Design a protein with these regions (language model features):
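Residue-level signal for well-ordered, solvent-exposed loop/turn and beta-edge residues enriched
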Residues: 1, 51-52, 90, 121, ...
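Extracytoplasmic beta-rich repeat domains
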Residues: 3-28, 52-69, 92-109, 135-149
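Short coil/turn segments within WD40 beta-propeller repeats
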Residues: 41, 79-80, 119-121, 159
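WD40 beta-propeller blade core
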Residues: 44, 82-83, 123, 162
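Short loop/turn segments that connect beta-strands within beta-propeller blades
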Residues: 47-51, 85-89, 126-130, 166-167
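Blade-level signature of beta-propeller repeat domains, shared across WD40, Kelch, NHL, RCC1
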Residues: 132, 138-167
Length: 167
């Protein structure tokens, strides 16, 4: 029996293609909040305590968002990275330096964010300002990032796995 059901993505547009939406990423639970993203849809924060949508903003992402330090960080399908306030939904910063680079999910490594791209680069981004701090080359197009015990696990589209450690 479902405890809670809510629509987290609403389609818009005139044609069937424009109205196509898809929830490809896994939801992120942070305290009493659940954060979801959708392709050609929205980034949505649901408050489990009230069982209501706290806020929703138009966004297109196929990646799992990162939720940390009161921020929701989304890597959009166009390559823009946006940080929102977890409670208000207000945009804190945006980074447009990686447009059209088919970004991976953002992750927190140490005190900074990391995203991967189609050219096999890992980009380090300041969590508070969105400024790009540096980059490193991997073995191929980055698909998924995961951080466990301060180590960055990088998987590529061609099946390679590399493990990086924060300095």
């Amino acid at each position: 029996v479902p405890r809670l059901q809510r629509r987290v993505a609403v389609s818009e547009g005139r044609s069937d293609i424009q109205r196509l939406i898809d929830v490809d990423s896994e939801p992120v639970v942070s305290g009493q909040y659940v954060v979801t993203t959708s392709f050609q849809g929205q980034v949505t924060v649901l408050d489990l305590a009230t069982q209501r949508i706290l806020w929703s903003e138009n966004s297109s992402s196929i990646n799992r968002p990162e939720v940390t330090d009161g921020k929701v960080i989304v890597s959009q399908t166009d390559g823009q990275i946006i940080a929102y306030d977890l409670i208000t939904g207000q945009e804190i910063w945006e980074n447009e330096q990686l447009l059209n680079r088919n970004l991976s999910n953002p992750v927190l490594l140490g005190s900074n964010l990391v995203v991967g791209d189609l050219d096999g680069y890992l980009h380090q981004i300041d969590l508070n300002s969105g400024t790009t701090l540096g980059r490193a080359k991997t073995s191929g197009e980055v698909r998924t990032l995961r951080v466990i015990d301060n180590q960055l696990y990088v998987s590529t589209r061609k099946g390679a796995l590399s493990i990086w450690q924060s300095r």
